[in-house]
């Protein structure tokens, strides 16, 4: 096994993105494990790894990885949204709603706002 260089890690990260796009979360995880081991502080790699766990229906590892990203980047709207989806799939709807609402507050993308399920405005009395 050869040593991981910055170049090979970038190649592995890009290949993992391609594998995830091709719906191969296991293949992506194999590559991302190397990248995260070499650079545990890299939130982009951790976010991609969390997505791979989610797509592979490994909800607990996905949750932990999304939480790690949010500890480092508490204003990452996508990470809040994805953690919300993960919790929703695990049938933890109240926890999910909190993260959906944080995502929508940070970035009012339609899918974030829709997931947040805000109460409709009340008509004036």
Q: What does each model-identified segment do?
A:
Residues 6-38:
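Alpha-helical segment of the N-proximal tetratricopeptide repeat
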């Amino acid at each position: 096994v050869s040593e991981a260089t910055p170049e090979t890690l970038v190649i592995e990260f890009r290949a993992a993105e391609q594998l995830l796009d091709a719906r191969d979360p296991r293949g992506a995880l194999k590559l991302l494990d190397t990248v995260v081991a070499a650079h545990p502080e890299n939130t982009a790699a951790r976010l991609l790894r969390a997505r791979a766990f989610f797509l592979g229906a490994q909800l607990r590892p996905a949750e932990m990885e999304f939480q790690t990203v949010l500890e480092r980047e508490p204003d990452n709207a996508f990470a809040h949204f994805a953690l919300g989806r993960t919790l929703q799939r695990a049938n933890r709807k109240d926890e999910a709603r909190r993260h959906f609402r944080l995502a929508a507050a940070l970035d009012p993308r339609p899918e974030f706002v829709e997931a947040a399920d805000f109460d409709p405005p009340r008509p004036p009395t």
